[in-house]
Amino acid sequence: MAQAEAPVEQATGEQEREAENTGTKAIAETHRFDEAALAKWMAANVEGYAGPLEVRQFKGGQSNPTYQLVTPGRNYVMRRKPPGKLLPSAHAVDREFRVISALHPTGFPVAKPYGLCTDDSVVGTMFYVMEMVEGRILWDQSLPAYAPPERHAIHMAALKTLADLHNTDYKAMGLEGFGRPGNYMSRQIDRWTKQYKASETQPLEAMERLIEWLPKSVPEDDQTTIVHADYRLDNMVMHATESRVVAVLDWELCTLGNPLADFTYVLMQWVNGTIAAIPDLTAHGIPTMEEYVAEYCRLTGRSGLPELNWYFAYNAFRLAGILQGIVGRVRDGTANSPQAAAQEARVPLLAEAAWKFAKMAGA
């Protein structure tokens, strides 16, 4: 499995990123709302709710403002669309709510959904409320605080949960219309091309080459499943003491599509992310890419994974498009976090990495 040269550097160190994204903060002025109106809505729509209500804003969450709702008996989480000018396909909190509402009864680890509000008059934008799941958020993929056996167990637990998602019968859950089966990769390339162009701040030759090459070289979609589309350790809650996923978070990008797009996005950590920088994965306790691929194939009944370099090129291109969208929101004044501006430097690095993978895939 070939790898591109030179890992793409993170915008900040993992410890800094954890500090920036862990815990709550005072509600940003641009994200304040009528808390009394929210409490009234909760009383009418959330079973078992009893005030008084205290609202705090979580740090991080650059896409959709996320709040901790504290009551004497129970804590909740609210996610809402940000105010201001928005890209048409972004911030789909209603889709998040729909998918966790479908998954929760099956036993798949998601937070219990309590209610969706599409009435902008309550807090200013659409929002939903779910339970607050307690446990560990693991920001550093290398898991420096853990012994090698637990590192291995945590990564394999995350992998099993992803395989469980891809093995789920979405039709039986009422999600047949959640996305369009077939041509997923082509549609995703088109989506992220449009987002990149809508938010473009500087011309990048590598992105232009990818925009031309990727649609012409798409592998055949061989399966349609639920895809999370942003699956990584820091988008899940791990049990407080066990190597077990208790909730997968941030379903904004979820749709029906090719599960290999999901899985190879996870694999990017092995080729140009934190895990790629570890010299001896086995000694560290983290599965090698070969082990991870073999186990995913075993869990999902595959004989192998073709054209990995094409998927790596696509995933780096896609991430460049996502980050360029954040850059655009900073420019337009709708970004949730001042740290979002730092992402701009990553876009050309990702574009160059994507083109290296594309060349290894035959471009």
Please place each PLM-identified region on the residue numbering.
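Juxta-kinase regulatory segment immediately upstream of eukaryotic protein kinase catalytic domains
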Residues: 13-49
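ATP-binding pocket architecture of kinase catalytic cores
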Residues: 52-226, 240-242
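All-alpha amphipathic helical-bundle segments outside canonical DNA-binding/catalytic cores
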Residues: 179-180, 303-315
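Catalytic-loop of the protein kinase fold
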Residues: 226-228, 233
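Hydrophobic residue at the +6 position relative to the catalytic HRD Asp in the kinase catalytic loop
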Residues: 236-238
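Activation of the activation-loop gatekeeper triad in protein kinase-fold domains
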Residues: 249-254
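Helical subdomain adjoining the active site within ATP-dependent kinase catalytic cores
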Residues: 304, 309, 321-363
